[in-house]
């Protein structure tokens, strides 16, 4: 059976691994997931990720999760905003700081996938993929 929301599945895997206090989790690979993981690493929500070859055509990403000094996950909230059944778009003027700049919006724009902060600076709107804090 095919997966209807691969990005939502990736977020759920990361969220569940964090709650179970796992050091890593494995997510199926794609270009958009790689872009999202790059932004999560850049914003400090994950330590790192690496590509793992499944076979000649498919690859997975091994995500290294990040925890604070009390062993609580750094990612407190990881929510899919725009789903395949309900797309959510936002204009650049409507992009506001999320959770008083503690959280981050990930937006898919015409210039690629970027944080809400960068999209606002470049005056680009787009589809709100997820929000995290």
Curated annotation (Swiss-Prot):
Pfam families for this protein: Ribosomal_S8
MF GO annotations: rRNA binding; structural constituent of ribosome
Gene3D superfamilies: 3.30.1370.30, 3.30.1490.10
Domain of life assignment: Bacteria
GO BP term, pick one: translation
InterPro entries: Ribosomal_uS8, Ribosomal_uS8_CS, Ribosomal_uS8_sf
Keyword rRNA processing carried by entry: no
Recorded GO CC terms: ribonucleoprotein complex; ribosome
Annotated keywords: Ribonucleoprotein, Ribosomal protein, RNA-binding, rRNA-binding
Quaternary structure annotation from Swiss-Prot or TrEMBL: Part of the 30S ribosomal subunit. Contacts proteins S5 and S12.
Similarity section: Belongs to the universal ribosomal protein uS8 family.
Purpose: One of the primary rRNA binding proteins, it binds directly to 16S rRNA central domain where it helps coordinate assembly of the platform of the 30S subunit.
Protein name, as recorded: Small ribosomal subunit protein uS8
Species in which this protein is naturally found: Leptospira interrogans serogroup Icterohaemorrhagiae serovar copenhageni (strain Fiocruz L1-130)
